[in-house]
Regions:
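N-terminal intrinsically disordered, cationic/polar leader segments
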Residues: 30-74, 78-82, 88-129, 134-182
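Generic macromolecular interface patches on structured domains
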Residues: 24-25, 77
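Cleavable N-terminal signal peptides
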Residues: 16-17, 26-27, 32
């Protein structure tokens, strides 16, 4: 089954990458025809009802708090986001599976947001953003991890695509983390 001609190129690429739209038994790029054991759990999020927002944060605003406020105001239930920009301070996390907790680091000072990516889902009916970031420092080094907080200077520019079908997270008994449950 081909998606050619039925969806704009960006959607065609997204769904093909997600492993959707491939006929049963047909091998897609990078997959053997022998099996589907490597396929992720998946759910079709939108057939065209997605909304894409440009979000621009200004100096002094806190990114994660702003994202949550935006999601609540617009009653968003699922989505994904990408972005770039610069921040003056950030709190990053690394999940330690042995401690079953995030180890937090405070990144002080100016840094470029080299890449910011994440998703939006519901936890106990409330919007929850899971965001990772790579920060570039003045000396050319980079720091990255789970983003807990980031204070903008001078701007952070995000593209958020929201889907009408709710996606939920459920607590994983092994890690204690709220993981996606499509």
């Amino acid at each position: 089954m081909s998606l050619s001609g039925t969806l704009p190129m960006t959607r065609r690429c997204f769904f093909a990458t997600a492993g959707l739209g491939v006929a049963p038994g047909a091998a897609s790029a990078g997959e053997s025809a022998a099996g589907t054991a490597d396929l992720p759990r998946a759910a079709l999020l939108s057939g065209g009802d997605a909304k894409t927002y440009l979000l621009v944060f200004d100096t002094g605003q806190e990114v994660m708090r702003g994202l949550l406020a935006f999601a609540r105001k617009h009653k968003l239930v699922a989505g994904h986001l990408t972005g770039i920009g610069a921040v003056r301070d950030a709190v990053l996390g690394y999940f330690d599976p042995h401690k079953k907790a995030y180890l937090r680091t405070h990144e002080k000072g100016q840094a470029d947001v080299l890449s910011l990516t994440g998703n939006l889902a519901l936890v106990k009916g409330e919007p929850f953003f899971h965001v990772h970031v790579a920060l570039g420092r003045r000396d050319g080094s980079a720091r990255g991890g789970h983003l807990f907080e980031a204070t903008v200077r001078p701007t952070v520019e995000l593209v958020l695509t929201a889907y009408p079908r709710p996606v939920r997270r459920k607590t994983d008994p092994e890690t204690g983390l709220p993981l996606l449950d499509p």
